Amino acid sequence: MAITVDGQERRIALALSGGGFRAAAFHLGVMRKLQSLGLLSRVDLLSCVSGGSIAGAFVALNWQRATVLDELENYLATRSIAVSSVIGGILDPFESRLDKLAKTYDRDLFKGASLSALRSGPRLYLNATNLSTGNMFFFVAGGAGPEEMGEHELGVVGAANFSLARAVAASSAFPPVFPPLRIDAPEYEPAAQVDYVTLADGGVYDNMGVNPTLRPRNAIDYLIVSDGGKPFANDAQPTESGGMVLKAALDIMMEQIRGLEFDRMQHRHQAGVGPKPMWFSIDSTNGQAQDGDAQFASSIKTNLTSLNAAQRAVLVRHGGALVESRIRVYAPELLA
């Protein structure tokens, strides 16, 4: 899958952020544009979070299918899964909301696939947050590598038979809408060190999914970061309501993490130890296809509700325009 640049093979990674169906449609636009530029098939590694995991896992599972992007768009246009999963979990005392979510993903997207079904596609990281240790917890498969799950503190184990739908559900278990995924020692042996692990939305730790792409063993040369998450809203007159103040404080912390991740990408590349980064966010106006696309795209809610035709059109157009503009400015050699 690597691309040849100046006579040498180079590896491309694509990071797909969290942000619900809005982010998934934004990423769809990015992947459509990469496909039209002849670069999607050259992607060696996908690192995904939450809404990005929904899109990335489905595309990776069906990597060879010509209609995969059309099928993803149809899914985003016709499914609203959050409400049904929440209500179903409340009414059913024997099955949690997260179990309902995983079953919904499996029915509509993954059809019983396990991580081992990803072997023909790029290396895929589905990122969650381990609330037991505070670390990023990943599920990884594809790219002719082993299927694994784990984290740096507790350890990594084989996971060929782990359900793809459960991995995506863990990555998108946004609190408090969905409870975390609990994994016990029989399924993840290192969990015995802490009784069990509880996995929540990967965006709690790293909403852009950048961490796996910077690991030396993945040897990435170019990093495209598609950030469809919620941009920080500057409010000249913030409310004094306790709940809103807490929300603003959390948003500021997330914005700081986002900025630090971007700085880390830049510094590593400038030091010669990291890939060339091409990062853009849903509120980026520099490179938008049409005036107002960034504002409209940013105003769409970050939930798991179906998107209408106008929303999908803008998100897809905006994502495609931004990724092409970044490549043409920062890595034109990829288009040579």
Predicted feature locations:
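Non-catalytic peripheral regions of patatin-like phospholipases
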Residues: 64-101, 142, 191-336
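Patatin-like phospholipase
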Residues: 9-15, 20-104, 140-141, 145-148
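Flexible loop/turn segments at secondary-structure boundaries
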Residues: 21-24, 53-56, 133-135, 206-208, ...
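Structural recognition of the beta-strand scaffold that forms the well-ordered cores
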Residues: 13, 45-48, 125-127, 199, ...
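Active-site gating loop/helix substructures
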Residues: 22, 78, 84, 88, ...
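N-terminal regions that are enriched for targeting/export leaders
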Residues: 1-6, 12
